[in-house]
């Protein structure tokens, strides 16, 4: 069974409050998502493997640690997941970025795949899949399935806010994928929105309706 990590750091919780606030404008919303993603990024990369190398400082030769092997790959679920990429790239500037394009049918709430573009070495990378909202879980499950079909083996799912229904579906369908979130909310309403949630993350990031 996949594990769920909820980040309760005071800075993250403070910023999530203003992400939720309907009076937060597009510019500030975008900045807050970026900031929270960076803060979460420190923790989600905590288990990255290290290897020791020899370097020379201005004073002496010494042994020091660097990240071992291939570095992280980032895979935002379009379009809202794009809002989380820069915050992670700030920490991992060498990361390669793939994209999975999905949209949710407004009637069935089922995800429809329209675009997948990935680095050629996804099987060798730890991939962090980003999407601000884990609501029904359908989009996350579809994205993870698409990545595994293309060779991905080491996957993590990073969201800002999740509903219990979405967490359960991901755990049922992809028990090997750990889930990292800033908050777990109460439930989904009849329209598939997380309650209390933050509304439509994509619309709030890009100023659309």
Swiss-Prot record:
Its cofactor is Mg(2+). InterPro entries: PRibTrfase_dom (IPR000836), PRTase-like (IPR029057), Upp_B (IPR034332), UPRTase/APRTase (IPR050054), Ura_phspho_trans (IPR005765). Its EC number is 2.4.2.9. Allosterically activated by GTP. Pathway: Pyrimidine metabolism; UMP biosynthesis via salvage pathway; UMP from uracil: step 1/1. SUPFAM superfamilies: PRTase-like (SSF53271). Keywords: Allosteric enzyme, Glycosyltransferase, GTP-binding, Magnesium, Nucleotide-binding, Transferase. GO terms for biological process: UMP salvage; uracil salvage. 5-phospho-alpha-D-ribose 1-diphosphate binds at residues 79, 104, 131-139, 200. It is an enzyme of class 2 (transferase). The keyword Transferase applies. Transmembrane segments: none annotated. It comes from the Bacteria. It catalyses: UMP + diphosphate = 5-phospho-alpha-D-ribose 1-diphosphate + uracil. Belongs to the UPRTase family. Catalyzes the conversion of uracil and 5-phospho-alpha-D-ribose 1-diphosphate (PRPP) to UMP and diphosphate. This is Uracil phosphoribosyltransferase. It comes from Brevibacillus brevis (strain 47 / JCM 6285 / NBRC 100599).
